[in-house]
């Protein structure tokens, strides 16, 4: 086997025909400035080719179901293994995914509870034993005399297929009737079932009327049904549409509650046999939230305090006003009283109705006027009812503005049906186990006491559970619980979970490509992560890690530095070799920072702030322990702490959502806290995250920052455009008129290729220029609109230097280090760090009131030390004009330049907050 991977002539995105040699079975770090072409080399070239070759080896039928990669723009790659990419973008937003399901630990837990669990009665909690035929007969005979019943054998329960053989066997055995998915059939008719749907089939063994003398016949029928279905009998009470399930397997003698034999699917909240029927296994339900109906309690009803759909129109002839007038008269309150001064009784009547008491309603409509007498259902009940009844998606979305998620009242947020939760191992049900942190769960498994027989059954299952929990601990995630939703994890956490899952599979000879696994990790947890990556390497795998973290670079076997600049100024290999060799390579910015020749300076003086404070009292969301926090306004504040210590809970869940609701009038529910003081010194809150600035190729930095409007107006003001009668709309590629209609302004046409990836080809009519010929004939300083959009920010600065509005916006893009980005570059091709800096530039170009608070969650993600320095300068500019910046960060360079630090801890999870 070759000892290296050789890439020849890589030209993807901004790569300049690069040749590179990567040693196999080593920890290799790819580094370089943001936008220099690291991801293009690692993900778009090496991973794409490795994945493509693997998928091409499969059958054409299998290829239909797998996303096909395009062949990357590269001459050839030699010595490539199957590639597995672990990046940050693929966090599951599915509400059904939890840490347990993603790591597959939950599958082993379901098996453990099904095989060695002790069932209890869900009603009285008593341990359940199996039922005998005699016990079943006694219970059936307790039904009232003359009750008509059917004794049925449930032969198929929730299995896919047409099940033709089941019906054939039943006919041969002389049975006449059956019930399929709740519908009765005659076995003489042809029963066609859908092959890919799950079905329930019960064969009718006997039909009886309850009398004293039927015991013997009933016994025979129950025995036959039990033998047919392997121990289960269904007694259907005719006329009541009620089924009683009996099991020779498990039932409670006192309550008569039967449960079927324990199977792993009973413990799955993604399966109808295990999921709570009320919330279908989600653990939460959408409920109308009074806080969102009346977001601002300082207003009165007449001033529009109630913002709920259908109740916000307070015009004197409206339906809502008719009800409010009647309520005010009956319960003696004034409609101009601020909501916060209304009594609890009055608020209760407005929200939850008059509970049957009638109101006298006076209506005066164009159709006539008169008086009505009727009860009022209350705004909350009205919204709930309309939500259940409406068929319109738009109406649903409008009503959801007044709703928030709350734990399901049936299962208390535990996702499973009560029968499943009544099964215990070591005294715990499966949900209680999943609510333990990884450390506590490991401790529980280590000290689990089982009988000798149980131990023999559970031995291999426990071994798998222990090893997987151990891997989660080894990547610094010991504070997570298995029941935590995958959607609530940060990018770094979800990436390390998938890393732990990969170690669990213990493959060798694989090429792993990782995208900044150290994100969101405190320096303390970094060593654990490095050890994990070295373990993966020692198994015989090659690790290619895109990373800026200094510790990781020093621990690497080999470093490849891509650069020297970003965008068009990058795309070359500046240095490659061991960390020592890179440090001594002239022209490598990475080498200069690693060797200490370049450093980010500590500021000479720190901002004192404006003397005002923003105070949070009693913060208690997630693991926060009723803490009080002060943030000095007009400063650059850094919130630090180990992973899982509560930083995001404090900043994103409480601070951002509360300020968003109060200052920006956004309908969100903030995390648990007592109160916040100091909001009056602020006028808005802005969260600058790394989400894309647009989801389609039509959005670009020019459209996002507002530059494009100014550029279109500039073109519309030229003599040529005026003579032709063109307005600014003519120069938009999103509307008819100026754009090329063949590609509708995309510049590309999508050609669907079945079994092969879709191909995008430049439009033949406009040659990829997005506009029609007439529009492109209008020039400004010798360039048409397409050529202007193709300029980079650096090229556009001298071109527009006499136009202050455009020049100032371009200057801010250049200041945040995006000089290499084209004005019309599709937003889908920007990295997270680049998208975040486009947003920062947009903020910098606005007129500042000096009363804004900016919130950033780990802004150094994807940034090289050189870029971090630029970022710090930009954030200082926001602070210099009086704004407040709050940053969650682990990067020591950012922390040392902050004016104020809030450190949470001391540990993650239960040990933090």
Task: Give residue spans per PLM region.
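Conserved phosphate-binding elements of NTP-dependent enzyme cores
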Residues: 1-912
